[in-house]
């Protein structure tokens, strides 16, 4: 077999790679996603080499112009790397030498692919975090606008998937806005550790060439530099942290999706899916399927899997760089795509894909025993110990179930057989709207408290 002279590292070898191994080893098919970031990092590195006098300013300018030419060719669809290029870094370097000649060979001075790929991945992820943050804001706004319209719409609240207490629908939707805010805060925190430059750490031990890591860090708008070169090239904590934050985003979306799926079923019938976000059956003409939330619920497992894969990958790696790290790219690329698409899909679903069936919701909150706690509270207000009141109401509910009658339908005389303290005002307490309105503790579902939450979120999201 002929010697693989096309490889930058081939002079150490006498024979070329087995074709299958060459393809197995290559990452160009997916790390081409890092092209923009690789060019940005290389331009910053070239400028630094010129400033430091490691190459002449003219050479630095030629390198930068050549890299910008590659950017233009890529934009025009003319930059087409092949498997033999191995990865995006070698593909760029090879193309640069083709464009500007031997001076292109000076670009890699004082740099290794180990610190280069870490830099590229951080630059790429920094942008994607900012994009996901905006996608989360869109979801928050979609939920908020629906919540603002439904302050006085009531919906059953559940524990153990059993009806518990009625809620303001706005309160229910605001809970997911809170989750999304925590997701945003987590991403903001992860971004701080993404935004540290490894460039200049070289292969693992730094370099003897008089580079300036601070110059490249500033050029690329990093917050600072790694203080340990070994850690710089071997750190993938930021990938794990991002995948952890992404997993929680998907967990929240999956919970929301599950509720939409339940609400759309005939058994709940709380919402009607519009034609814009539902599909039909190839066999059963009556079906309208909640494919969007089902897909999001299913896709959550992909991101969870990538997190587990990354943790498993890094747990046994000795310092410093190992080829295993190549596996982080597809995990993070797919996770970003999955999270972004899922956020957009769920946002569209709440913007134009569902309608709450208010008559059905009203029927649901008026035909159960979710007001039982308020009967106990009624007695507590008359100085009966809560546990005693709780036990009494339990017996009342048992009687109601046995007789097939709701609490609101007991005549006053029957109420008094349970306890002498029951008066006519018990009926007002039993109304679902009264039950909700009375929950005035901070963060509660009482209309006043929810209105306060709505005003606060409008200020945060729209000002």
Curated annotation (Swiss-Prot):
One of its GO terms (biological process) is arginine biosynthetic process via ornithine. It comes from the Bacteria. One of its GO terms (cellular component) is cytosol. It catalyses: 2-(N(omega)-L-arginino)succinate = fumarate + L-arginine. Its EC number is 4.3.2.1. PROSITE patterns: FUMARATE_LYASES (PS00163). Pathway: Amino-acid biosynthesis; L-arginine biosynthesis; L-arginine from L-ornithine and carbamoyl phosphate: step 3/3. Keywords: Amino-acid biosynthesis, Arginine biosynthesis, Cytoplasm, Lyase. One of its GO terms (molecular function) is argininosuccinate lyase activity. It is found in: Cytoplasm. The keyword Nuclease does not apply. Pfam families: ASL_C2, Lyase_1. HAMAP family: Arg_succ_lyase. NCBIfam families: argH (TIGR00838). Belongs to the lyase 1 family. Argininosuccinate lyase subfamily. This is Argininosuccinate lyase. It comes from Prochlorococcus marinus (strain NATL1A). The gene is argH.
